[in-house]
Amino acid sequence: NSLIPFTYGGGVYAIPETLSFPILFYRTDILAELGIEVPKTWDDVTEMIVDLSHNNMQFGFAGSLQNFATMLYQNNGKVYSDDATASAFNENEAITAFEKYTKLYQYFKIPVTFEFANRFRNGQMPIAVADYMQYNTLRIFASEIDGLWSIAPVPGTMRSDGTINRTVVGTATGCIMIKGTKNKESAWKFMQWWTSADIQEQYGKKVEEKLGASARYAAANAVALEHLPWSYEFYNELSSQIKNVTCIPEVPGGYFTSRHFSNAFRKVIYQNENPRETLLEYTKEINAEITDKRNEFGLTTGGKGH
């Protein structure tokens, strides 16, 4: 799935190099003291938020397109139409997910933004969804709580068959070859060599030898990532989450998606606007830009939302 943001129109335009994705961090000592179990679903989360608030504590889940898309995919929605010509935010799955997502901030008052490491360290936020590479920060910045925290998969959405959809949205970087490259064969061999499991593993370990645990490398190569010096407990949970990582596709004009999602989100949170109507309003703006860019690039324009 780390290929998704580099795939368009049947072509693949990069080889994944790094992959970051969210995981659930929690303070084992504080949750045990409060008698709170690690939440498995978002329904569990809302129940837990009430218990945390009674103790002047918070649950962390930042307001962002990436986090909304996690809930969207868990509810069988998508960011763009199947033909990649329009936003899918006007579909019922997206509207339902947006209503659930904004409710966390409107009614349960979780913070839109926060500084994770400090709040997690001092116990104000004993449980939060954050990028798994925050592991690096906590190992160095919060060494005094070593052994007092752990990770688990991000809470999911219950399916009709009783299983839990644990999909999360990650972000990837990739290696590309410039179109005008003179030595294409040599460049291609280098890209294959650089992104291979052995070399990515060696690179990750050498960087960590030089800079310490805070420099743990977010390899997109799953084999290389597995062979980095994780503890058994940490990697066991990490590998469980990796199986459910997806990425948001890239489309012409797609930069308006994050911009207008943010506009819609903040309008609902800060101005108490109707989630459905607000999302539909900004979806029109997203689609207008996608249409303009498709016209600019000479692509066939059509599909839903135009």
Where is each model-derived feature located?
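Periplasmic-binding protein-like
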Residues: 98-99, 148-176
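A bilobed periplasmic-binding-protein/Venus flytrap-type ligand-binding module shared by bacterial periplasmic
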Residues: 25-28, 170-183
